[in-house]
């Protein structure tokens, strides 16, 4: 298990570093970085399909699509949802929205709990219910003080929840399904990358070509590291370690100069308390399981 924990934490650190890495790719815009990231990351995802013996699962999806043609719309929807999230992740640090997106990732486990309860009738423990209530208080305070949550935080928390729920409903929540979803993004990403005048960009950032290759390399290594970790760890441990990424994102947000305004502090405190409650419950369950 130690190996899995180290791999999961390494993946979170790499994903957190990607949040910062996009600031090194200026003057490229969010769409440009998004296009290049998918182009350079997809080969790693395809390699993972072969490495983890998911080739047959990919073929089975094509059989399902042939039998159920409407399933292709599910893949297209999920592909679009995933693409929006990846774009937002890369766009935010260069546009003053790094903290807002980080808040969205902190809210995500709470919205996932609500989706699990409302859509899949999953049980909610008292601790998780308390965490949701505290987060709701933070959200309500933000509505009173600022008129509502930022669109970035809402897009992350509810967008990703919808994405994961749709994958579960359609039974495409595996590596093979992820590979097909990312592959469907390729035409759009090629278009975005094709529009970039790399010669002009190189005049402003002479290392841009090397940085773009590193973008794909870091993304691919982070993704495959996470996949390996997920195969070594129980799902509850993996979920608990998943909090490392939003913490890294918060750190990056402060590192690049973003600051909390006074109206947002109550939301921040409530989300941190909720996160601590989630993590505490997870640790208690792990202790009981391996006692």
From Swiss-Prot:
InterPro entries: EamA_dom, RarD. Pfam families: EamA. The keyword Membrane applies. Disulfide bonds: none annotated. The keyword Signal does not apply. It comes from the Bacteria. One of its GO terms (cellular component) is plasma membrane. The chain crosses the membrane at residues 5-23, 33-52, 69-91, 101-120, 127-144, 148-165, 172-194, 209-228, 235-257, 262-284. It is found in: Cell membrane. Its main location: membrane. Keywords: Cell membrane, Membrane, Transmembrane, Transmembrane helix, Transport. Belongs to the EamA transporter family. This is Uncharacterized transporter PM1281. It comes from Pasteurella multocida (strain Pm70).
